Amino acid sequence: MSGRGKGGKGLGKGGAKRHRKVLRDNIQGITKPAIRRLARRGGVKRISGLIYEETRGVLKVFLENVIRDAVTYCEHAKRKTVTAMDVVYALKRQGRTLYGFGG
């Protein structure tokens, strides 16, 4: 690692990529009890059985939008790591200001 500066292998050199697991159905990791707890925190008493899949779908779309914006901020700054501030700015852009994470 002599004299390469920022980025280990040197920017643009490529190199061997790690094997990445194929992502499928990770949205099912948001379990029924987890959705139930969120609803309870929001003051819901009874929950229809159809709510769980609908909630997973809505959450997936919301997270995709926030993550897309956060990654855009990260790429613009020529970084490879998404920071908490990238997420804060992404949420602010969507009109959902979040306090307590810097900035």
Swiss-Prot record:
Matching InterPro entries: CENP-T/H4_C, Histone-fold, Histone_H4, Histone_H4_CS
Domain of life: Eukaryota
GO molecular-function terms, A-Z: DNA binding; protein heterodimerization activity; structural constituent of chromatin
Protein's name in the database: Histone H4
Gene Ontology BP term (one): innate immune response
Subcellular location: Nucleus; Chromosome
Residues where N6-acetyllysine is found: 17
GO CC term (a single one): nucleus
Task of the protein: Core component of nucleosome. Nucleosomes wrap and compact DNA into chromatin, limiting DNA accessibility to the cellular machineries which require DNA as a template. Histones thereby play a central role in transcription regulation, DNA repair, DNA replication and chromosomal stability. DNA accessibility is regulated via a complex set of post-translational modifications of histones, also called histone code, and nucleosome remodeling.
Subunit-structure text: The nucleosome is a histone octamer containing two molecules each of H2A, H2B, H3 and H4 assembled in one H3-H4 heterotetramer and two H2A-H2B heterodimers. The octamer wraps approximately 147 bp of DNA.
Chain residue ranges for the region called Disordered: 1-20
Similarity comment: family membership: Belongs to the histone H4 family.
Keywords linked to the UniProt accession: Acetylation, Chromosome, DNA-binding, Methylation, Nucleosome core, Nucleus
Residues annotated with N6-methyllysine modification: 21
Gly residues composition-biased segments: 1-14
Modified sites of kind N6-acetyl-N6-methyllysine: 6, 13
Modified residues (N-acetylserine): 2
Presence of keyword Acetylation: yes
Organism: Caenorhabditis elegans
